[in-house]
Amino acid sequence: MQLRKPATAILALALSAGLAQADDAAPAAGSTLDKIAKNGVIVVGHRESSVPFSYYDNQQKVVGYSQDYSNAIVEAVKKKLNKPDLQVKLIPITSQNRIPLLQNGTFDFECGSTTNNVERQKQAAFSDTIFVVGTRLLTKKGGDIKDFANLKDKAVVVTSGTTSEVLLNKLNEEQKMNMRIISAKDHGDSFRTLESGRAVAFMMDDALLAGERAKAKKPDNWEIVGKPQSQEAYGCMLRKDDPQFKKLMDDTIAQVQTSGEAEKWFDKWFKNPIPPKNLNMNFELSDEKHCSLN
């Protein structure tokens, strides 16, 4: 399910000629492409442990499904600027600091596990959709937690700075569930909180939960449960008011998805053994979510 653009089809047709000209034009002054051209370097934000989207492998190389999108965008920038030897600098970011670091110019864009929603669009711009997730629960298999209603009076962990944290706090307040919500610094810390017994469930995007389960010492001891509290679209994040760079990113994403490359990336990262431990996530997409790859 590709994220729909707000413009109507008629408006899109009316703008198409102008956009084509913008794509061929030199980088606009003050734009991201202008900054990259002047500095001779593109700075890419990445996650450290968002398996299998953006994370370090056992060689400390940044890899993942979303990182493949980042790499494709970098290649498109090199081609656009005619700079095949453009320096590429990678900067680790977190759920908490990704938006401030983007806004202050520390990095130019990121493709990771960032949800594109109305609230974040006030602070940053987003590419078209690269993945669709549902927010669910990871819990011990065979336990009492089967859905969100079972969390009443229980300790639940969630990663700080995420949309899941907002949703969980809202659910707790509106349903008067008296949950003790633990906000962990990253997904790995969230799972360790669950694994240690300090929480009965870990709420997060289902694909990220599958990644944490795959990394566990005994993956079969854990299961993903619960009706999704939201369906969320991941997009690559860039600074606001930069239509030229956004178009380059969207065009690159469209090419990857229509060529079938995105399908290959999904199979590579979600249905086959992946580094660093050669674990297989065995993650399947619903028909609706599968449309985000096409």
Predicted regions and their residues:
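Acidic, polar ligand-binding/catalytic clefts
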Residues: 71, 75, 83-150, 290-292
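Extracytoplasmic small-molecule ligand-binding "clamshell" domains
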Residues: 24-109
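Beta->alpha turn/N-cap motifs
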Residues: 46-50, 91-96, 105-117, 141, ...
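Bilobed "Venus flytrap"/periplasmic-binding protein-like clamshell domains
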Residues: 43, 49-52, 62-79, 115, ...
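Ligand-binding clefts/hinges and TM-proximal coupling segments of bilobed small-molecule sensing domains
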Residues: 23-27, 163-182, 220-222, 253-294
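Extended ligand-binding regions for polar small-molecule ligands
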Residues: 23-27, 71-76, 149, 154-155, ...
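A ligand-binding cleft/hinge motif common to bilobed small-molecule-binding domains
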Residues: 97, 111-122, 167-174, 195-230
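Periplasmic-binding protein-like
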Residues: 48, 131-139, 206, 214-253, ...
